[in-house]
From Swiss-Prot:
Gene3D superfamilies: Vaccinia Virus protein VP39. HAMAP family: RNA_methyltr_E (MF_01547). The gene is rlmE. Its main location: cytoplasm. The active site is at K163. This is Ribosomal RNA large subunit methyltransferase E. The keyword Protein biosynthesis does not apply. One of its GO terms (molecular function) is rRNA (uridine-2'-O-)-methyltransferase activity. Belongs to the class I-like SAM-binding methyltransferase superfamily. RNA methyltransferase RlmE family. It is found in: Cytoplasm. Keywords: Cytoplasm, Methyltransferase, rRNA processing, S-adenosyl-L-methionine, Transferase. It comes from Glaesserella parasuis serovar 5 (strain SH0165) (Haemophilus parasuis). It is an enzyme of class 2 (transferase). GO terms for cellular component: cytoplasm. It comes from the Bacteria.
């Protein structure tokens, strides 16, 4: 006899397939609904311009990278990384590996090269256990790694957009970002589910 889905997972699946952004993504042959989150951020904050170099952390299945290539044009460049595999996207240099591992970080830095990048973006999230005492520290560890990437590769006046889950450590992290960037906003895009703790910190004017 097969295992039955839990009530919560069945509810999530029902919500997922009814979601207008999931339906739009499917209709437009987009990688994921995350495409629309970044589009809303771009309409408000104007992070991406033609010819930019962008680092995409936690890139799979590719919604953000897919969006960014439409904004930066054929002279721009996206360097993307995820622990999961991702189907190729024209204009995206993809590295599969665990960003938490030093060898993967070094490989990513090698792909970036000697120059600095214009935007670092992170949609990374841990595999959630359902226990906030475990999940939130894991999520905060990933966003700290993303901020460390900014310190290493982001050009002065560059931008950073990162998915963060509200909980313990959020306020301290926000203060840390405010010390490094001139303008910092917290966004909750329409395409982000209301029940989700996720928000997006959008930081511009890197002081590095």
């Amino acid at each position: 006899m097969g295992r039955k889905r839990s009530a919560s997972s069945s509810r999530w699946l029902a919500e997922h397939f009814k979601d207008q952004f999931v339906q739009k993504a499917h209709k437009q042959k987009l990688r994921s609904r995350a495409y629309f989150k970044l589009d809303e951020i771009q309409q408000t904050d104007r992070l991406f311009k033609h010819g930019m170099t962008v680092v995409d952390l936690g890139a799979a299945p590719g919604g953000w990278s897919q969006y960014v290539v439409t904004q930066i044009g054929d002279k721009g460049r996206v360097i993307a990384c995820d622990i999961l595999d991702m189907n190729p996207i024209v204009g995206v240099d993809f590295l599969q590996g665990d960003f938490c591992e030093e060898s993967v970080l070094n490989a990513l830095l090698e792909r970036v090269g000697e120059g600095k990048v214009d935007v670092v973006m992170s949609d990374m999230a841990p595999n959630f256990s359902g226990m906030s005492s475990v999940d939130i520290p894991r999520a905060m560890y990933l966003v700290e790694l993303a901020l460390d990437m900014c310190r290493q590769v982001l050009a002065p006046k560059g931008s950073f957009v990162v998915k963060v889950f509200q909980g313990e450590g959020f306020d301290d992290y926000l203060r840390e970002i405010r010390s490094l960037f001139n303008v910092v906003k917290v966004r909750k895009p329409e395409a982000s589910r209301d029940r989700s703790r996720e928000v997006y910190i959008v930081a511009t004017g890197y002081k590095g």
